[in-house]
Amino acid sequence: MSDASRVLTLDEISHLTQEGGKPAETLMNVVALIAKRFQTDVCSAYLLEPDRTNLVLAATLGLRRECVGMLRLALNEGLAGMVAEQVRPVAVAEATKHPRFKFFPEAGEEKYHSFLGVPLIDRGVLQGVLVVQTTEPRTFGEQDIRMLTDAAAQVANVVSEARTLEKFIAPVQERLWALARNLWWSWDHDTVSIFRDLDPVRWAQLNHNPITLLSELPLADVERRAGELMLHGRINYAYRRQQEYLHSDRTWGATHAGVLRPRPVAYFSAEFGVHESLPIYSGGLGVLAGDHIKSASDLDIPLVAIGLFYREGYFKQRLDASGWQQEDYLLTDLSKLPMEPAIGADGLPVNIQIETRSGVIRAKVWRIKVGRIDLLLLDSDEITSRLYGGDGRVRIRQELLLGVGGVRALRAMGITPGVFHMNEGHSGFAVLEAIRERMYDEGLTFDQAVPYVKQEVVFTTHTPVPAGHDRFGADLIEEHLGPLRDALGISHERLMELGSEAGEGHQWQFCMTVLGLKLSRRANAVSSLHGVVSRAMWPGVPIGHITNGVHVPTWLAPQMYRLYDRHLGADWHLHSGESRIWEGIENIDDGELWETHLSLKSTLIQFVRRRAVDQAERRGESPESIQRLSRVLSPDALTIGFARRFATYKRANLILRDIEKLGSMVNDPKRPVQFVFAGKAHPRDEPGKGVLQEIAALMRDRQFAEKFVFVEDYDINVGRFLVQGVDVWLNNPRRPLEASGTSGQKVVLNGGLNLSVLDGWWAEAYDGLNGFAIGTGRTHSNMDVHDTRDSEALYRVLHDEVIPLYYQRDRDGLPRGWIKRMKRTIRTLGWRFNADRMVMDYTLKTYVPAAGGTSSEMRQAF
């Protein structure tokens, strides 16, 4: 570099440092300038942490930016550590051959060879290290060293300013709150780690709620923690990524869903399971809806979600001394949720009302940001106090509010949907309100308006048994829909026909699923087998299928995420619904994959032990019992997980049908097996509670005491630990009663293997080598015979296939056959059963055609 260039560069750096911007942003700009002027591929600034024994990456151009604030090295590690340790410049032409070279694969360092680092010193105090690197070997001369040293002197001043927290804390606080108010943080591992690091103990106690955490933490504590942990760079980087995410126009949706931009999809669901800190879900349906809108956000699908706000949510579960389920309902503090009033087109908070024969239902409307998606929640005090609580009268009022109220809320906000997607029949009344609006707006009769609205309706059914569909008597229908029926200009009989099956005669029951099927142009089941079952249940109705999937960033463990980053490419998550991305799984070293899995398994076991102890202490159990529970489960034993709703058809107790066989398995000294169970029974499901009690009793049986654990109060958090840490996921419903199931899909992403009846999604996923099957798919009309056959098949596959394969190790101690199956399950199923693929299917096969974007017709099976 010439003297003139040197002077110009120093002048430019001086200009940047004097602009008065935020220190972290200035530092980013300076390293970018240095890389350009030095013609290097990388320029990075590492700051000395307060303990003065570690460096942390604070700014970089060339390395992976997600490593800012995350990549740390001790002063005795690497070449950068050597610069700080010896407080002198270090120049190496071929860094990979130097004895102090340390490889950081997460930073993408494998491409860079030459290294020049100089200390950052301000007023005689070491602040950090400034580094440049190139992809080709290069010898840095005295002039290069002098030039970078001069630049470092100016950069050190910026670093000193960055450490002056008075100038830094206001934007940090502001950005922390901006991150907390959008649930995007819940599926961004780096942002989650920021909130956790602020106060790990309180974070866990608050059920991972950043709004509550920030409300409790005094400003001084935030300042102290941010300074101690060097969080500033991480916070700024997380905020910047959030803003880039929210405002990017280079998305899948921008290319494929443009027709939905002026008139978005209105997605209705009775529950949404987005995160454990927002407890308005009970189980699979809600978690699926949460995953649906997260992937819609990631893909940038124009969509607005509509649900209900349950102030007491679903119940908190605890078991009494006999193992019987008890339910507690807790009132949610609205101020501790990322909610704000929805604002209407008139600039005022939205309030809606619905007339019934027995009075007016009034509701407020809240808005929650879920990435790019608005989630609107209608709140009507007692009507929406509890999810799935109350009698038929409460239920119909909730569904009236969800459907009719949801459409009116959209209208009040100036939103005109181009597509109405009903996730199950609970929101079916929305179509009637949409018809009324079309009649009013365009001067049409009911019969004229129906075809127009029907074309825009997508209906998803999740229930494979007739008894599972909501039905209401004629009196309840007339009481609650009478005024709407009057506005539609139809008779009571005509309205009842819309929800009645043929041949029901005068004993009319209004079925919400029938309403959804009759008033939708496109209807789908949620797996291939469920499509077959649904078409048999509703003969003559063209029901296709779109198989459910799960949101990858939500359910994938951070350790596995980093593993995929290294082997699938840094942007693999942007294309997780494409099969080609997952081929790289085969390139992962067996040992690396296995060690990652064992780490997650250890984390699960520690979590289960803590919960088991907490449960025992709450019940007042003896110190001896508590001590025993602190040691439950072995990290070396084959660990099988089962977690889901405790409905009797899911047969949580199938494994108990032959206690002698089960006992021999769990107590085998050479090849032991252990089980972790979790799940809730519906408060009115006494048989389901009985099954749960059977499972819980094994924790007190000496033969099974340390091999069977029931984790109380199953929620998204418990589910996350289980699906990320188990070796095997057990699923044994009575075929064909499982519409899809998604918990096993979450296990796939983390390398666990499914052991399942060929029902729901597993019927189309299993290929003989990517997991294990219970039976061959045969059923029997006699329930006891059916269960006996399946239990025998379960014991057989455990004894003959699962257990031997897990414990078969090579000379390195690795279960190569098991790992081969792990890789196959990830490679063959990771792309097929994730929510990105699912939402892309809905968009191309239902949303775009429903909005008039294509002329394609829905086939029976799509």
Where are these regions (language model features)?
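Short hydrophobic/glycine-rich mini-motifs in sensory/regulatory modules
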Residues: 120-130
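Catalytic cores of carbohydrate-active enzymes across secretory and cytosolic contexts
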Residues: 166-862
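Allosteric cytosolic regulatory segments
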Residues: 149-157
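A short, aliphatic-rich beta-strand micro-motif
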Residues: 113-121
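Short regulatory alpha-helical segment in sensory/regulatory domains of signaling proteins that mediates
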Residues: 14-21, 30-39, 45-49, 65, ...
